[in-house]
UniProtKB/Swiss-Prot annotation:
Origin species: Brassica napus (Rape)
One family name in Pfam for this protein: Ribosomal_S2
One function term, GO molecular function aspect: structural constituent of ribosome
Gene that produces this protein: LRP
One GO biological process term: translation
Name used for this protein in its record: Small ribosomal subunit protein uS2
SUPFAM superfamilies cross-referenced by the UniProt entry: Ribosomal protein S2
Keyword DNA repair recorded: no
Chief location: cytoplasm
Length: 292
């Protein structure tokens, strides 16, 4: 019993250290009256600090509720906040739940005429303020709701509120990683004293620029395909030196002489008969005028 207690205590301490490193304990400058019970203190700059011991206990409670659902497909984990979409997809991958990353389509839980209509048994959200539409629809359908709540988050229609920083990309990834590991431990997939081989970095939000490899630079085609640089022959032939007269061929074509200039229009010779029997062209008649 003592060994199990020490193992659980050491694991709890390690989780709290990880949450401190991911800034899970940092709240906002505003505090809802329903979140005051989870606040440890207030800093001089007005930022509220969460009690991470209560955050860890709420994570354990949420994991017990998730394990109580027989079919993981009846669980929907959703995040409209961009920082939580990657964490939502990873959580659904390891726990078997359904993930909705992005904007919530109104009527998904209430309108039976929609093709995306579903009736989940449990709804897990990242931010009650951002995901207010699924919270309202879940309340109309009597769906239990688990949400990560900041100090300024509204708690209406939220059944289990996990006090944590739900605005940082490291904080959201750390929370979903801890929740997924607790669920797998309670299901028996991994032992309680065993370290999970999945890194928490996989749950963090990544910028689109970070997904590209750093060494993706433009290279020359010959370097890419292993071809040598092209060599152009005839380098000695293309010279700018003057060519001597003796190098030119001896038999050159005689230049074409210019036609003799006629004195007037009437002095020009009449055209000869064309080949093939055609007669010579008749010269035009001169019009008689009275100008003298």
């Amino acid at each position: 019993m003592a060994a199990n207690g020490s193992t659980q205590l050491s694991q709890k301490e390690a989780d709290i250290k990880m949450m401190c490193a991911a800034e899970v304990h940092l709240g906002t400058k505003n505090c809802n009256y329903q979140m005051e019970r989870y606040v440890f203190k207030r800093r001089n700059d007005g930022i509220y600090i969460f009690n991470l011991g209560k955050t860890w206990e709420k994570l354990m409670m949420a994991a017990r509720v998730i394990v109580a659902i027989e079919n993981p497909q009846d669980i929907i984990v959703q995040s409209a906040r961009p920082y939580g979409q990657r964490a939502v997809l990873k959580f659904a991958q390891y726990t078997g739940a359904n993930a909705i990353a992005g904007r919530h389509t109104p009527g998904t839980f209430t309108n039976q005429m929609q093709t995306s209509f579903s009736e989940p048994r449990l709804l897990i959200l990242t931010d009650p303020r951002t995901d207010h539409q699924p919270i309202k629809e879940g309340a109309l359908g009597n769906i239990p709701i688990i949400a990560f709540c900041d100090t300024d988050s509204p708690m209406r229609f939220v059944d289990i509120g996990i006090p944590a920083n739900n605005k940082g990309k490291h904080s959201i990834g750390c929370l979903f990683w801890l929740l997924a590991r607790m669920v797998l431990q309670m299901r028996g997939t991994i032992r309680p004293a065993q370290k999970w081989d999945v890194m928490v970095d996989l749950f963090f939000y990544r910028e689109p620029e970070e997904t590209k490899p750093e060494d993706e630079d433009e290279v020359a085609p010959q370097a890419e395909f292993g071809l040598p640089a092209p060599e152009y022959g005839g380098g000695d032939q293309w010279t700018t030196a003057a060519i001597p007269d003796a190098a030119w061929p001896g038999e050159a074509q005689a230049p074409i002489s210019a036609a003799p200039a006629a004195g007037s229009w009437n002095d020009s010779a009449a055209p000869a008969a064309a080949e093939g029997g055609w007669d010579a062209a008749v010269p035009p008649t001169t019009a008689v005028t009275n100008w003298e």
